[in-house]
Amino acid sequence: MIITIGGRSGAGKTSVAHTLARRLGYRFYSMGDLRGRMAMERGITIDELNEIGKKESWTDKEVDEFQKKLGKKEDRFIIEGWLSFYFIPHSFKVFLDVNSEAAAKRIFKNQRPDEEPQESAREVLKMVKKRMAESQKRYRKYYGVDCFCEECYDLVINTTNLTISQVVSKIITELKIWKSKNKTRQEKRRKKK
C-alpha cells in the first residue's frame, strides 16, 4: 500500500505524512525536503531553484524520476509531494487543504532552512502564493497536470481547524474504505476474464 499526500502549502502535509507513517509502520519520503536538499547543496534557496526550474527542467525531473522508480520498486510507504499522486497513480491519494490565513501562520511559525527568512505571516503568505502559482504553472507546462486539482485525489481534507492526530485518523478510516472498494473492483475484473 502506497499513500501519496499532496495539497496546499501550510496544510500540514509533511507533519501528517510523517505521523501517519509512524502510525502505520511505513517508510516516509518528502519531495519538498528532497528539493530543499538539492537547493542547499547548490548554495541556493528553494525559491531560487524554482526560478531556475522555469527555464530548466532538471530541477523537477530528478525528483520526478525518483518518485516514479519508488512507486514501481517499493511498497508500504507514504510520500508527500505536489506531484506524487501523478507519478504513483496506483496509490491512495490524499489532498490536504487549508485556508490562507492559517497556512501563513503555520509556515511563519515553522520556517524552513532552505527558504528565505520572512519577517511576518503576511510576507509568508505572499511568498507561498507566488511559489504555488509558479509551481502549478511549471507542472502544467511539463506534464499537463494541475497539482491542486482536488478531483485528482481519493480523499480531500480541510485541515484548518483540525489537529494532526485528527487528520491522520480521518485518513486511516478512509483508507480502509478505499482498500475495501478497490478489492471488490479487482475481484470483479478477475471474474470477467
Show which residues each predicted segment covers:
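Hydrophobic positions on the alpha1 helix immediately C-terminal to the Walker A/P-loop
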Residues: 16
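C-terminal accessory "lid"/substrate-recognition subdomains
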Residues: 137-138, 154-156, 166-193
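Hydrophobic anchor at the beta1->P-loop junction of P-loop NTPases
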Residues: 5
